[in-house]
Amino acid sequence: MATYLIEVGTEELPADFVAAAIAQLKDRVSHSLTEYFLTPDGIEVYGTPRRLAVLIQGLPDQQADREEEIKGPPAAAAFKEGQPTKAAEGFARKQGVELSALEVRPTEKGDFVFVQKKTLGRPTPEILQELVLGWFTALEGRRFMRWADGDLRFPRPIRWLVSLWNDAVLPLELVNGSGKLEAGRISRGHRILHQGDVTLNNAADYVVTLQQAFVEVNPQVREEKIVAGVKAAAAEIGGEAEMPADLLAEVVNLVEYPTAVVGDIEAEFLELPTEVITTVMVTHQRYFAVRDRQDKTKLLPKFITISNGDPKKSEIIAAGNGRVIRARLADGQFFYRADCDEHLETYLPQLEAVTFQEELGTMRDKVDRIMEISQQIAEQLGLSEADKEIIASTAMLCKADLVTQMVYEFPELQGIMGQKYALVSGEAPAVAEGIFEHYLPRNADDILPQTLAGQVVGMGDRLDTLVSIFGLGMIPSGSSDPFALRRAANAIITVAWDAGLEIDLGELLAQGAKDFVTAHPDKTSPLEALQSFFIQRIQTLLQDEKGIDYDLVNAVLGDDAEYTERALTDLLDVGDRAAFLQSIRDDGQLAKIYATVNRSAKLAAKGNLSTDSLDPTGVINPEKFAQNSERDLYAGLVELVPTTEVARTERDYQKLIDGLAALAPTVERFFDGEDSVLVMAEDPAVRENRLNLLGLLRNHARVLADFGAIVKQ
């Protein structure tokens, strides 16, 4: 068994590309080898800022011989009166066999021509020479470039190639325009700590040889060293380091030989909000912040950076990094002090100079719309005047920090600085918290807003964006969603579910669409598109986030206007019904009533009873009963009416299920008992009466879900 190494050496690669390329190569190499009937013992993919490498262990010297049975054309097309046709000749020629090798065999679809073909295994090195460069040139990512006079695209110029089959060079040639790069056994060590070439004598020694040249090619090992180094450095200065996952993942692919270095900042900068300091450190400088071990709310006047340089020069490295961050923090300090000189409300007029979207006006216009929608939501929730005032102030000020100097310089601090400046301006803490929280959740893994102001204003902001962008016809399609509208809709639904907010989303969408058309008379109403979009988001969230079976989700959302309206009118109810259905499927209750309800619903579809009718009075004529099973079913339906009404108004669907379960034996008698009836009786009045009985049963079940959408399990 052999070991093969391919290393592609480059100029400094973007950190995000290194991580993405490693993931792509793992998948691509595995599938590629499988496609060529090669099964190695292991595949390792490595990456640093200057190289990507694949190390394949336990490769056979060649493919195994294999026999394949290949199906050809139908026998009727391949042979006419016992003689081969052009179809048979073409099939034989394509497979490289004589006509005599063709066999006719029966299949489920008739007789077909087959050939038993033996393929000799090819040498593995020969196959690799055809495949390996394609693994790299097919990589996907952003910010690709061309260099020299060639058309080859890669994030950075490729400078060297290593290709080793055990201890021998496996020749490869990368052509780029007039340039040509031939693979060998020469790699490169660390740019600073090991200047010059590194000779690789054997593919199996790749990792160790480069470690001796101060390059750790394994990103997992680099991460372990970084984590250990940062923790140790923080402990030495009496602190604990913050290590955000995103920052750690990026830093891992910024260095080849990581060393943790501690630097200092002036204590005066600690007057800045913690978020400003950590944003400068993490987002702009890729440093790790350090909190006081005794008081985690406080930052130490220190930072930890991961150096790719000489560990012996850590003091020089720390000083250089310190000068850079001090300049950034000094700017932040100036911005913060200048911004605090003004009341947050005084920034509102400046929003008139900030465009939200060309056809949708300024950010000041958007704030006005957010205020209006937020008050509509507050009215729906029946909030107190005090809560309404807090929401109104939050909505008015929620975007004011966008034009402050701090947020202009550090956009990622929007909302955070709004909260700080609101407190400095003397606004109520609830308003300040709402300004920050209205942006939550910022992504799928983020925390949710906990204050009414944050919840309501956040919904108002997102609803305005959705209605406005949909009104312009910019509806998400496929993977394209430049305005993050799916995330906005998900946030509205998730916040409502989490906080138990009984909002009428249908009414809000209708009013929003109406207001949009009033403001843009040349545009058509986006209402239907918005309704459909939100139903899709509810469906996705119930399945993917709540873990509800797909058919149960379909059952609560239905496929008609009644269910759509109900889902949008009462978001809490649709979530509750889906969760309840899942619970009674899991505990077996659903199975006990499924057949009864479904059979009734299918027959009821042949009648004309409206789906909103629950009371037998007026739709059932007891004088038309011929059997006791009809009378008992009627009596049971009469008793079920108050139960269903309670279930609907109080969302106590267990009562409804209990009522349906109690009625199930009566329904079974109606269909199959000694006093069963023929539903589709010849007498039209009798037939309608019996269909209406079943229709009423269906309608009671529909208060919970459309049982016709449920798949029997």
Swiss-Prot record:
InterPro entries: DALR_anticod-bd, Gly-tRNA-synth_bsu, Gly-tRNA-synth_heterodimer. Tetramer of two alpha and two beta subunits. It comes from Picosynechococcus sp. (strain ATCC 27264 / PCC 7002 / PR-6) (Agmenellum quadruplicatum). It is found in: Cytoplasm. Its main location: cytoplasm. PANTHER family: GLYCINE--TRNA LIGASE, CHLOROPLASTIC_MITOCHONDRIAL 2, GLYCYL-TRNA SYNTHETASE. GO terms for cellular component: cytosol. GO terms for biological process: arginyl-tRNA aminoacylation; glycyl-tRNA aminoacylation. This is Glycine--tRNA ligase beta subunit. Keywords: Aminoacyl-tRNA synthetase, ATP-binding, Cytoplasm, Ligase, Nucleotide-binding, Protein biosynthesis. Its EC number is 6.1.1.14. HAMAP family: Gly_tRNA_synth_beta. It catalyses: tRNA(Gly) + glycine + ATP = glycyl-tRNA(Gly) + AMP + diphosphate. It holds the Pfam family tRNA_synt_2f. The keyword Acyltransferase does not apply. Belongs to the class-II aminoacyl-tRNA synthetase family. It comes from the Bacteria. The keyword Cell wall biogenesis/degradation does not apply. One of its GO terms (molecular function) is ATP binding.
